[in-house]
Each structure stands twice: as C-alpha cells, then as structure tokens.
C-alpha cells in the first residue's frame, strides 16, 4: 500500500466571478481532493489579486492555497479532474519534501513584519536625528 505524502495545491480561480461562485469553486476543489482519498490539513484563501500576465484573457484571479496528504497515484486523478474545470485559470500541485519544509520553518522563524511606508520613514528620520546628535 502506498504511503500518504504531504502536498500543496495552489489554484487561481477566475476573479471576475461573484464571491459565491468563487466560494463554490473552492468547495469543488476541496471536494475533489477528499473524494479521491486526500485529507486536507489547511486552506488559505489569499483573495483577489492582479495576475502577472493575462491567463485565458483574464487579468484578475482569486488565489487559494490548500495543504493536504494523499497517496501518489491520487495526484494524477486530482489533476485530471482539475484540468477540465473552466473556472480555474491555473493550478499547481507540489510535493512538500523535507528540505522544503525545513526552509519554510526557517523563513517563518526569521521573517520580519514590515510596517507601513510611513512607519519606515519615521524610523529613518529618528535614526538620522540620533546620528546627527
């Protein structure tokens, strides 16, 4: 029997759809994963963003990120179903290996929350005043 591995799936849903249609598309993606034998561990709805380039003549997409565990043969079945969904502009399923997970932990550990541009200007002004004294 095949062991389950950790995967992440990022989808871009047509941003021109109503919020209800986008939510229905997200439910559909989650349903496909669970029906094919996957177990979802987290769902992150990133929201509407401008795409870097037009995809199927669309420039706005609603991004979502799903982490799940599944057996390797199941991934091909999930991709086969997602490939023909018209509301999905793009999808990508990636196997999360140990080096990727370790890198993610390091990034989370050392990441710094950057404030607003006004905060940065104020801190630079304060630093300049301290140097001048």
From Swiss-Prot:
Per UniProt, the keywords (alphabetical) are: Ribonucleoprotein, Ribosomal protein, RNA-binding, rRNA-binding
Q: What name is this protein filed under?
A: Small ribosomal subunit protein bS6
Q: Name one Pfam family in it.
A: Ribosomal_S6
One Gene Ontology MF term:
small ribosomal subunit rRNA binding
Q: Which family does it belong to?
A: Belongs to the bacterial ribosomal protein bS6 family.
GO cellular component, alphabetical, reads:
cytoplasm; ribonucleoprotein complex; ribosome
Look up keyword rRNA-binding and say if it applies: yes
Q: What domain of life does the UniProt record list for this protein's source?
A: Bacteria
Biological processes per GO annotation: translation
Could you tell me which Gene3D superfamilies the record lists for this protein?
3.30.70.60
